Amino acid sequence: MSSRWIQWTCCGLWPFGKSSRQYRQIINVYEDDSERVRAEIDMGLPPGVSVGDLLQNRQGEEAIRQAHMLALQSNAITDYLQRFDSVRVPESCQSIVSAQIAKLRSVQHIIWNTMISMAVGNVTIDDSTLKVLLNKQAGESMALMEMEKLAAALKMDGSTDWAQNIASVVTAPPRAAREQMAFREPIYDDPEGGMEMIDLSSTPGPTPAPTPAPSMERVAVPAS
């Protein structure tokens, strides 16, 4: 028994008939609407092509290069922040680390604002301005190398045992100085282990000022 609302196909049963592709009317009215223009571009692109592919031409090559350089800087900052968020920073290092993290986040916000301006405003920045921005990022993060060492230590050792000796390592004298201090001769040699008492009451008073020497001037004697 067959019915009109039942259709048999080679792939199965379609109770309400075989579905057809939904029809979408092509927008042919051009208005000053960024969302409409964006939808038209997305609709008109061939399969497998994105808006980013369209920018990879001679006109957008400079913008892509600059955006890539800024993205690398932002990714590096994100990596630092993720490292320090994954471990517990000792209390003795929290003030220094917090100050550097605040600088890194402020620089990352500057980079993000620049990339947003390049994407939304369709503008590019010249190489000199980009170098100034990157140099500013390096200037405001002068302790990046020290943070790299600290981050490497945090990554290698997840515990906080390594931080217990930081103060002693920083404040202790160098090894050569320590060895020299260890083999230095004592000022007072007291083999009996006693202590020499000094009577402060018998301490002599201030030394009097020296008497100036008599003058040895020559006096001319008239000849007789």
Curated annotation (Swiss-Prot):
It is found in: Virion tegument; Host cytoplasm; Host Golgi apparatus. Signal peptide: none annotated. A lipid is attached at residue 11 (S-palmitoyl cysteine). Residues 188-224 are annotated as: Disordered. It comes from the Viruses. The keyword ATP-binding does not apply. GO terms for cellular component: host cell Golgi apparatus; viral tegument. Its main location: virion. Keywords: Host cytoplasm, Host Golgi apparatus, Lipoprotein, Palmitate, Phosphoprotein, Virion, Virion tegument. The keyword Chloroplast does not apply. Phosphorylated. Belongs to the herpesviridae UL51 family. Oligomerizes. Interacts with UL7 homolog; this interaction mediates UL7 homolog incorporation to virions. Plays several roles during the time course of infection, including egress of virus particles from the perinuclear space and secondary envelopment of cytoplasmic capsids that bud into specific trans-Golgi network (TGN)-derived membranes. This is Tegument protein UL51 homolog. The lineage of its organism: Viruses, Duplodnaviria, Heunggongvirae, Peploviricota, Herviviricetes. The gene is 55.
